[in-house]
Regions:
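Periplasmic c-type cytochrome electron-transfer domains
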Residues: 18-503
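Bacterial N-terminal signal peptides that target proteins for export
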Residues: 1-8
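Bacterial N-terminal signal peptides
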Residues: 8-16
Length: 503
């Protein structure tokens, strides 16, 4: 009997939710032969979909690197060719070095601003890792806001269903300005404590951030303004995620719907400047970006103030006269970053390797993996995929590497939107995403955040101070999974965290 991809995924998700005893039974069953892989979108591989706990995969397939420490997120895919490694190094240079205000003698790197959040990509994605919110618990040690941005919009839909920017401050609140240009204002945070208990009586305290846009330099904000804080995530494995066949992601949604439970993931569809069409969203906290190329070019503009061919206009609004009057750093192409440089940065981000798992055979980690499946975490955090063709074949090899195709990977995500409940809701739609929905983030590399970034702040705004706090913030579709974890013993909670941190 021939099974559709949706039914195959549905069956896998049911198996993922079984008890440890049931999972052991599945593991003992004969492995099914992989189905033939048609190009460009291979059908789901039954051997992967029915994989049971206790069978660890290299997170990035042949791209995986064995690394820990400060540089664990900064290494090229292990299977890159020599010429590709040269491009990786060039892209890394432009990702990490600061841009300067124009005009300057360093014409290859001038054009910063007029408004900006950081002077480089690496200013937010430090060591290619995750940013953290400023620590306002210590007023004697102020910290910059680099890495945390505030999206802005008002009700309605713009072109292609995009959010409508605030008429004065645009679609992003930029606190910094170059010499002679005022920053847009200050972003302030305070925290409210949320108390709770596990079923065994152990108390816990969460911290809920409350935001304020203050010291506004261009007049009042719209009275019906909607805001959404977003923290900069780690950027490992992006090219592999981009190579997951769209059919697999849509099969995830179909399978979840077929199960009839509370988990019902939805795809987002967004406008992509490189594809020049509506495409499936894969990146961003609301799956509001379809490609690494679009994300990179739009971040250069929005976060650093650097124009490119597909984003040639600054974000200054009519009310921001000093911003409009500021000089630019345009080069021969009439923009501030040439395509060849931008392509190298895109290639760099596409080929950053996921690091290998640690302690995968530890008994506590294996126990935690069984609990992860028992709590049905794997229904959203789908463990494995087989990558397919690149997203933009016509632009190859400028933006990608052939070594990213045909890889068996373990990112632990379905790349779908889920209603995460009132506590995490921002109330701000983003294309097809509602104000209660967030994309399932990949879990690979999460245990190395303390090594790379000296913290483990998680979720879309960095409010969670570790894995267990992140789980406790889950609501909406994930409420049942959260409540299962609340019922776990202290030993089981520790094992669950150890498993997630081994990824």
């Amino acid at each position: 009997m021939n099974l559709s991809p949706s039914l195959l995924v549905a069956a896998s998700l049911v198996l993922m939710g079984c008890s440890a005893q049931q999972q052991d039974t599945v593991a003992a069953a004969p492995a099914r032969a992989p189905a033939p892989q048609p190009a460009p979108d291979p059908a789901p591989d039954p051997a992967l979909l029915f994989a049971a706990p206790g069978e660890p995969l290299p997170p990035g397939g042949q791209t995986t690197v064995h690394a820990t420490g400060r540089n664990a997120f900064s290494l090229p895919a292990a299977n890159l060719e020599d010429a590709e490694r040269t491009r990786f190094v060039i892209g890394n240079s432009f990702f990490k070095r600061n841009w300067v205000q124009a005009p300057a003698s360093t014409t290859a790197r001038d054009g910063l601003g007029p408004h900006f959040l950081a002077r480089s990509c690496g200013g937010c994605h430090v060591q290619d890792g995750r940013a953290q919110p400023p620590d306002f618990h210590n007023p004697l040690k102020p910290q910059p806001f680099a890495g945390l941005l505030m999206r802005l919009s008002i009700p309605g839909e713009g072109p292609h269903g995009s959010p409508v920017p605030d008429p004065v401050y645009g679609d992003q609140f930029n606190t910094e300005g170059v010499l002679g240009v005022k920053g847009e204002g200050q972003l302030r945070i305070r925290y409210e404590q949320v108390h709770g208990r596990f079923a065994d009586g152990t108390a816990y305290t969460l911290e809920k951030p409350v935001y304020e846009l203050a010291a506004l330099n261009y007049g009042p904000l719209a009275s019906n303004l909607m805001t959404s804080p977003r923290i900069a995530p780690q950027v490992i494995g992006l090219g592999l995620l981009e190579h997951i066949p769209e059919s697999e992601i849509l099969a995830n949604a179909a399978a979840q719907a077929a199960l009839g439970g509370p988990i019902k993931g939805q795809p987002n569809y967004v406008w992509d400047a490189y594809g020049e069409r509506m495409m499936l969203g894969r990146f961003g906290w609301k799956a509001n970006v379809a490609s690494i190329a679009h994300q990179t070019a739009s971040a250069f503009l929005g976060d650093i103030g650097i124009t490119s061919k597909r984003f040639p206009h600054q974000t200054c609004t009519p009310a921001q006269k000093d911003c409009l009057a500021a000089p630019n750093g345009n080069g021969a192409e009439g923009v501030e970053i040439e395509d060849r440089v931008l392509d190298d940065v895109i290639f760099y981000q596409a080929t950053l390797a996921p690091p290998a798992r640690r302690n995968a055979s530890d008994p506590a980690v294996r126990r935690g993996e069984a609990l992860f499946h028992q709590a049905q975490c794997a229904q959203c955090h789908r463990p494995s995929y087989k990558t397919g063709a690149e997203l933009f074949p016509a632009l190859s090899p400028a933006l990608s590497s052939k070594g990213l195709s045909g890889q068996t990977i373990a990112p632990y995500t379905d790349l779908l939107l889920h209603d995460m409940g009132d506590a995490l809701a921002d109330g701000r739609p983003d294309f097809k995403a509602s104000g209660r929905q967030w994309r399932t983030p990949p879990l690979w590399g999460i245990g190395l955040l303390p090594d790379v970034n000296n913290h483990q702040r998680l979720l879309h705004d960095g409010r969670a101070r570790g894995v267990l706090e992140a789980i406790l913030w889950h609501g909406g579709e994930a409420e049942a999974a959260r409540e299962q974890v609340r019922q776990f013993s202290a030993e089981d909670r520790e094992a669950l965290v150890k498993f997630v941190e081994s990824l």
